[in-house]
């Protein structure tokens, strides 16, 4: 009888813990699936109920406006994300011989950038300052930590001479630039593109355990 009383007390305390009525936005808060009902109704351990709420049967936690919630602010600008997915971001600075060449590359790369965030799309942003091109790439690691996804870009460079492939390495990312010497897309109006050559960037995202 004494052990039974302790079990009942644990269930009652559970309702006031994380995910109970005391925290409206917790895993067992507002409106939810069967997992949330199990957590607040005392039919099973709180941990198992919370796992069901975010699992395949309970669905992803919902934000205040009905969208998939993220750990930071309850919103995900890129659409629904799996609980085990992470958003990977990569910044690249590429110097060119002149501001016109950097602007030429920015215009060509911007054609491939999605105007609005879409689920599963790679988000790319390009900015020019002088002869420097700043590239920002964001992708969602849907396969879990440690997996890689390759993103390819095709662009034209105003440089008349081809260059050997080179690697830019950081502790987490590897970026390869290749100039195969094939003709690239036509340059924008006003640019000197007589020696335009094809350039391809391969960005490999890796998410090692930290």
Curated annotation (Swiss-Prot):
Cited Pfam families: Pcc1
Membrane-spanning segments: none
Gene for this chain: CTAG2
Example GO biological process: tRNA threonylcarbamoyladenosine metabolic process
Organism taxonomic ancestry: Eukaryota, Metazoa, Chordata, Craniata, Vertebrata
Biased segments, Basic and acidic residues type: 163-177
Annotated region described as Disordered, given as residue ranges: 1-80, 154-197
InterPro entries linked to this entry: CTAG/Pcc1 (IPR015419)
GO cellular component: centrosome
The protein's name in its UniProt record: Cancer/testis antigen 2
Bias type Gly residues, positions: 1-47, 56-66
Tissue: Testis and very low level in placenta and in some uterus samples. Observed in 25-50% of tumor samples of melanomas, non-small-cell lung carcinomas, bladder, prostate and head and neck cancers.
Record Gene3D superfamilies: Alpha-D-phosphohexomutase, C-terminal domain
Assigned protein family: Belongs to the CTAG/PCC1 family.
Organism: Homo sapiens
